[in-house]
């Protein structure tokens, strides 16, 4: 029986929903430190691991602002339901044009509820900003986007994640991955989900070879457990950095299908890699009968 994965209210391309069971299975059973994510994104991994203590960080201030609003009860499921019903009606009556009014309003005032509205009604769930920091993703062209069932689904997601946050000690910070990893202690577990190098990404900041090498060097010198995710290969090419940089660590893979962007080239099956410094004897105890993950390199 597969574990139920709780989906957060914020969507993004490349969300790690399908990797959550694999990640949960390799988290050390005796883990009692802080769960640290330098690239929290939607937060789907942290909210499903549901640790008692968590430090969740990102360079996208709008993600951090949204989850701090949930933590502080400034955003609740009921508030989201009322807001999306009201704004959804305006969207429908305008045949979708109201989306661009909300986008302009968000770019001026940065309200978390507007960010949620845009995130759930933009094209393909993309999170993309221009050089001036303005959200610039177009409308999904579905004026009836916020039907009652969809609003209920989102408000339930807000309530579920709010409950998880309220049961633990969660800190959300907007800062660089270097600063976040610098806060890690020996008993902590670090999960990194950086933008995938060499792939189409929609993050607040770009990611290149220098960033990948800096992350590798930072994690290599870390005196704590880490797990990081990246892409391994697809039908077109392989991620050379897995071989050239990360091959000294244990690497596990899982294949699944990603919907990324409008390009057919980016809609092929992709093999994900989980890279970790967790000891080999612990990895060897992972149940392999489901075929979810496979140790491919040591």
UniProtKB/Swiss-Prot annotation:
Annotated source species: Escherichia coli
Enzyme Commission numbers on file: 2.1.1.72
NCBIfam families: dam
InterPro entries assigned to the protein according to its UniProt record, in alphabetical order: Ade_MeTrfase_dom_2, DNA_methylase_N6_adenine_CS, M_m6A_EcoRV, MeTrfase_D12, SAM-dependent_MTases_sf
Recorded family membership: Belongs to the N(4)/N(6)-methyltransferase family.
Name of the protein in question: Type II methyltransferase M.EcoRV
Record Pfam families: MethyltransfD12
Annotated catalysed reactions: a 2'-deoxyadenosine in DNA + S-adenosyl-L-methionine = an N(6)-methyl-2'-deoxyadenosine in DNA + S-adenosyl-L-homocysteine + H(+)
GO MF annotations in UniProt: S-adenosyl-L-methionine binding; sequence-specific DNA binding; site-specific DNA-methyltransferase (adenine-specific) activity
Biological processes annotated in GO: DNA restriction-modification system; methylation; mismatch repair
Keywords: DNA-binding, Methyltransferase, Plasmid, Restriction system, S-adenosyl-L-methionine, Transferase
């Amino acid at each position: 029986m597969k574990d139920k994965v709780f989906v957060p209210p914020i969507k993004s391309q490349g969300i790690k929903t399908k990797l959550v069971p694999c990640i949960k299975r390799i988290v050390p059973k005796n883990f009692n430190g802080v769960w640290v994510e330098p690239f929290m994104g939607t937060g789907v991994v942290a909210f499903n691991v549901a640790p008692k203590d968590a430090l969740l960080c990102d360079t996208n201030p709008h993600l951090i602002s949204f989850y701090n609003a949930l933590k502080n009860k400034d955003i609740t499921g009921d508030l989201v339901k009322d807001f999306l019903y009201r704004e959804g009606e305006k969207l429908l009556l305008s045949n979708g044009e109201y989306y661009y009014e909300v986008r302009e309003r968000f770019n001026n005032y940065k309200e978390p509820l507007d960010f949620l509205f845009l995130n759930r009604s933009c094209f393909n769930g993309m999170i993309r900003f221009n050089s001036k920091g303005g959200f610039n993703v177009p409308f999904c062209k579905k004026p009836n986007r916020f039907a009652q069932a969809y609003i209920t689904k989102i408000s339930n997601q807000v309530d579920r994640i709010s409950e998880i946050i309220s049961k633990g000690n969660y800190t959300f910070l907007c800062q660089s991955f270097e600063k976040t990893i610098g806060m890690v202690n020996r008993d902590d577990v670090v999960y990194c989900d950086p933008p995938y190098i060499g792939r189409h990404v929609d993050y607040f900041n770009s990611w290149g070879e220098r960033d990948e090498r800096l992350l590798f060097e930072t994690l290599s010198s870390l005196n704590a457990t880490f797990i990081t995710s990246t892409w391994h290969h697809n039908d077109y090419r392989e991620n050379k950095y897995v071989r050239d940089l990360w091959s000294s660590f244990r690497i596990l893979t899982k294949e699944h299908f990603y919907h990324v962007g409008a390009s057919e080239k980016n809609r092929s099956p992709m093999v994900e890699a989980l890279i970790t410094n967790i000891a080999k004897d612990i990895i060897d105890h992972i149940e392999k009968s489901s075929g979810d993950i496979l140790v491919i390199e040591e």
